[in-house]
């Protein structure tokens, strides 16, 4: 068993450190993906609450599978609409340890098109 950190853990720590340095007072758009679904939340860390969220498990997204870039794009568009309705337009993108590629990139692009700035 390896004593070192996995590549995923290393990326996660590096991203979180950069978020703390650059994030300032803006909420963060946190993304989590699994093999079947993708989840996005806009989190206000100062208040300790979730401002807006969307995932492929939502009732309005039930017809779409979460394992595609199209489904991730619809989640990005939905979370952007909900965040704008809550009064949030500027966020910091928190990809966690996930590579900015594929479904994560599709979600980010759709959130930008939906009006979120990051």
From Swiss-Prot:
Which CDD domains does the entry link to?
Ribosomal_L18_L5e
Official protein name in the record: Large ribosomal subunit protein uL18
Q: Which family does it belong to?
A: Belongs to the universal ribosomal protein uL18 family.
Which InterPro entries does the record cross-reference, listed alphabetically?
A: Ribosomal_uL18_bac-type, Ribosomal_uL18_bac/euk
Sorted alphabetically, the keyword list is: Ribonucleoprotein, Ribosomal protein, RNA-binding, rRNA-binding
- Asked if the record carries the keyword Transmembrane helix, the reply is no
Task: Report the record's Gene Ontology biological process terms.
Answer: translation
What's the source species for this entry?
Rhizorhabdus wittichii (strain DSM 6014 / CCUG 31198 / JCM 15750 / NBRC 105917 / EY 4224 / RW1)
Q: Which PANTHER family match?
A: 39S RIBOSOMAL PROTEIN L18, MITOCHONDRIAL (PTHR12899), LARGE RIBOSOMAL SUBUNIT PROTEIN UL18M (PTHR12899:SF3)
Its assembly, as annotated, is: Part of the 50S ribosomal subunit; part of the 5S rRNA/L5/L18/L25 subcomplex. Contacts the 5S and 23S rRNAs.
| Cellular component terms per the entry's GO annotation | cytosolic large ribosomal subunit
| Gene3D superfamilies, A to Z | 3.30.420.100
MF terms from GO for this chain are:
5S rRNA binding; structural constituent of ribosome
Transmembrane regions listed in the UniProt entry: none
The UniProt function text for this chain reads: This is one of the proteins that bind and probably mediate the attachment of the 5S RNA into the large ribosomal subunit, where it forms part of the central protuberance.
């Amino acid at each position: 068993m390896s004593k070192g950190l996995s590549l995923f853990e290393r990326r996660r720590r590096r991203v979180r450190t950069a978020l703390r340095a650059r994030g300032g007072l803006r909420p963060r758009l946190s993304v989590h993906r699994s093999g079947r679904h993708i989840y996005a939340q806009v989190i206000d860390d100062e208040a300790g609450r979730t401002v807006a969220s969307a995932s492929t498990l939502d009732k309005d997204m039930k017809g779409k599978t979460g394992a595609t870039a199209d489904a991730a794009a619809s989640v990005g568009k939905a979370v952007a609409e909900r965040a704008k309705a809550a009064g949030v337009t500027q966020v910091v993108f928190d990809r966690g340890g996930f590579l900015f590629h594929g479904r994560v990139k599709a979600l980010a692009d759709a959130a930008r098109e939906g009006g979120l700035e990051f």
